[in-house]
Amino acid sequence: MMRLNEVIQKGTGCIEIKSGYGLNLEDELKMLRVIQRMKETSKAKIVSTFLGAHAVARGMSQEEYVKLIIDEMIPEVGRQKLADFVDVFCDHGFFTPTETARILEAAATWGMR
């Protein structure tokens, strides 16, 4: 909250905060819940972004992880209304344009932009 208050004092009016380093449902939800609490208590406008597709979780294949994001993570984030937006790290060695489109389409069905 200290950094948040500091940027507010410097004139920032809107702040985007992303999840994305948990790489599993439990940790992604934990980060998004913290962001939700900040949204409820901050004077600034905060938008939350689900970035579960930041990297592939260790021990999973690319397709297994994409399936986890689409079938489990996005629906739970959507049910709890924890994210306004979704982001995908679409780049060589990470998520392909096809995987990115699948993830974005799934998130859109849950109201994430």
Question: Whereabouts are the PLM-identified features?
Answer:
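Metal-coordinating catalytic core of metallo-dependent amide/deamination hydrolases
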Residues: 1, 5-6, 13-113
